[in-house]
């Protein structure tokens, strides 16, 4: 297998320096010296996820071994601490919003284009899981220049809480979300609810799907226990004719069999990786 090299750093929003975005870049060995640049893929986790969760390091490694550069990030509202593996920043999680996710993607993209040593801006792609899938679709549609999108188990809307929950959330000033993996109870404040209600048009995932010019692959498990297959089907139906493909993996769950800590690739994850990397290779050719 080809070797890879990694770089980790933190970006801060200029107008809100308390909002930190942790970034991990992984490319082929010596990628920084490649003449003409290499394709870059922005990778975004989902809700309660992070860039070192489960399959993400393996996904990053596979991208790099394929001759591309993976740019993974923890959103400023992920709640992940300095150790990059613990959801210890409760205040950041409390103030998370979908719009902040989009701003984080913009911040990383801007840094990449202005400071990346070997970025070929004609060969950019995005890859997101779950909530991250919906966010990268919104981001890609707005930017308009991504050559490929990969959405794993994507949400099709941001209004994910029922009316009763939203009313109680507004009344109590927060909603509590259990973390089945860690046993933590995460609190989310009104910023997220305000964002959902005030920025509905900007956060319209299906509307963005209908407008996107980016070739889009959707991979979804038929037994996804977190996001229904109907979400993927509705996104696929909204995409302009011929611009999207839906790959349904029979019996696969939301994380394609992956756990945290990572225990290796099973059949479902291998299938998801194979079809996704093929999509990238077709739309981000290694030679112009």
Where in this protein do the model-derived segments appear?
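Short beta-strand/loop motif that positions the catalytic acidic residue
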Residues: 211-212, 218-220, 224
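Short, surface-exposed "cap/lid" segments of acyl-processing enzymes
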Residues: 29-76
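Alpha/beta-hydrolase active-site loop
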Residues: 92-116
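Catalytic active-site module of serine/aspartate enzymes centered on a nucleophile-bearing elbow/loop
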Residues: 252, 256, 260-288
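N-terminal cap/lid segment of alpha/beta-hydrolase-fold proteins
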Residues: 1-36
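Alpha/beta-hydrolase fold nucleophile elbow
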Residues: 117-129
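Hydrolase active-site cap/lid region
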Residues: 142-191
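Short alpha-helix in the alpha/beta-hydrolase fold that links the catalytic acid
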Residues: 56, 214, 228-237
